[in-house]
Amino acid sequence: MVSIVLAVSLAGCGIVTVVPIGEEASFTGKEAFDSGAQSSDDWSAVVEDIKGKAADVSEVLANGADGTAVSGSAKIVEFNTETPKHYLVVEVEGYSGGEVRIQAGGVYSGTAIRDAQSVKAFEDFANQTEWSQYAKALNQEADTQVVAPLSIDESVAGKTVTFTGAAAEGGGAVTITPVEMTIE
């Protein structure tokens, strides 16, 4: 009787392979998702896509800007660094609504670039986590490719910014994440 119980209890046992973290691909054949590489590879196409569908910022602001590709020029009122989410406060001619901001370094928030582009769709990713990581990586590309080379500081107040980007509404402000930007 003991041998029957022992045989039944050991029947479900097998050899288990412990896979070290980061080496899963060598066992499954599936490469780990690299949001940085994906966004870097896609960046030029994303920029062209957003540029191709960007509407004039003053027209978009009048009709609601959430998730919209925009382009235009504006006067820089200030470079706000009071929080880690640095941004330019800008004045768009003909618009008297809430504050308009352009993200400008430090910490970026939102998914506006990902949501405004049509190069990649949710279905191109394995799950929501990868889709979210892709949005964050696109924001990082915007910082590296667009904002950081400008070395923005407080001296930009009063200058004109020309931009193309993706707009999102929230908290009484419209925030634009740039994919192209110049300051003169």
Language-model segments: residues:
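Sec-dependent bacterial lipoprotein signal peptides
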Residues: 1-13
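OB-fold and OB-like single-stranded nucleic-acid-recognition modules
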Residues: 11-184
